[in-house]
Amino acid sequence: MSRTDDKTLRESMYIKPEAVDPDRHITAKYYVEGNAPMNKMAEEAAIENSTGTWTLVGYETLEVRKKFGAKIFRVTGSNGSGFIELAYEAANYDPELGGINCLLSDIAGNIFDMKILDNVKLMELNFPKYWLQAYKGPKFGVEGTRKAAGIDEKRPIVGSITKPNIGLDAKTYGKLAYETALGGIDFMKDDEAIVSPKYCPLEDRVTETMAGIDRAMEQTGKKVLYAVNITTRQDKLLELADKAIQAGANHLMVCGPYIGYGGLQALAEDPSVKVPIHCHRVGHAAFTRSAKHGIDVAVWSKLMRMCGADQLHIGSVEGKFYYDEAETQRNIKALRVPLEHVKQTMPCSSAGNRPGNLGVSVKTLGMDMMFLAGGGVHGHPDGSTAGAKAMMQALHAAMAGIPVEQAAKENKELARALPTLTLAH
């Protein structure tokens, strides 16, 4: 068998940007750094991410590389850092058998471990129409979530996170749910740290929490959604979802990075799951936070949307975790931008939200949002009912364009919250 020389094979990998076919190619943009010319880094990445390996092999003919190999269509930068853009043959990856899991194993796999690349970050990922059509996306999305919460106006959803994170028994959960729901919020959820410890079994927690919510609704007339955390091994997700729903849950929650794309997709697409899915991003920063290495959070969020997240966490504007405004806006765009038939995912802000910063959060992030507070509700000096009321008072002030300090003059719960619920760091 005659082999094509390396130079000819490498030359075959370059195409002009106008040759990229949106109906045929999956395109990816990477930031790269390394001790080599940009084109050399692009070539090695394209080879590793498609047909090639560390040496030429007999059956990797020129025809194979031309037909199935990754193509380089744009390289920018110099002095060992910049951006490379590659077009992958979508036919290499079946969107349903293998799907996102297989795709990322190739185009966002070994590239992170290559010696020639000191740093690499996947910044953008775009799909042909037929690939997107294979993903059903959220069942509820933004408007469906509002409807499920009984909200008939275009406003953010405000909710609470049960605190302390762990350590409460089911009866106490129910008591806290009742107290919080009395304050008029729309939503409450488990902390990501709890699923079903022996002192607070999931089914008991759901039963007691929903009983507390129902008791509050008898007084307020207001529906409240409760997202119960069912994060578990993938083959047990549907079983746990069924147990939660049978116990009365009107919402589910999962930790996206740890159940994976396939776990979320299987849960969201199952016809037995007729409630929204709240997706926490806990753990995402392990691969998204570095500006130079990993996967951009907007790419990850886009994939979570495709796989069926009805709501997805994006961090908070003035909170306790890392925040970058440009990154956050890029992330929100990934959840809202038109994507064929796929519904919008509702962005969820949490981690340091409180009555005093809700106004700036609404102004920065918009109305099609969910804002959650844990300590910002339960840390209120007068208790969780007052904390929930203060959050709703802050929301109404923000929507009316009234400064929170002014609104506090007419709302005692808000007035009590402002001097005490502040972040020291």
Describe the predicted segments one by one.
Residues 1-182:
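N-terminal capping/small domains of soluble enzymes
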Residues 30-36, 156-174, 224-236, 283-297, ...:
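Active-site mouth loops of central-metabolism enzymes
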Residues 49-50, 54, 200-228, 261-283, ...:
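Alpha-helix-loop-beta-strand connector modules within alpha/beta enzyme cores
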Residues 138-149, 194-216, 234-237, 256-274, ...:
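Active-site-adjacent beta->alpha loops and helix N-cap segments on the catalytic face
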Residues 166-230:
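Internal metal/ion-chelating core segments
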Residues 239-242, 247-373:
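Catalytic alpha/beta core domains of metabolic enzymes, predominantly
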Residues 384-425:
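Extended, intrinsically disordered, low-complexity segments
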